Amino acid sequence: MVRLLGAILVAGGAAFHVECKRAERFNAYAAMEQAQHDANGHAVPVVMHRRNRKPWLVVMRLKDFLALLK
């Protein structure tokens, strides 16, 4: 089940703070820093990014990705 609680997405028992960016220029580290700050330690920070005429990409820390695989 997926639920949206304010800026927090809850899916499969895990909470994610999703930061969406739609821009031609993209700084992954700056976007991740913003997501980490906004998540405030209560959720896994995730950044979604899209450029014009390109598919969406998802950026997350490796340690968080590996935890999802467990």
Which residue ranges define each predicted feature?
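Domain-level recognition of nuclease-like catalytic cores that cleave nucleotide substrates
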Residues: 44-70
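Catalytic centers of nucleases
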Residues: 1-38
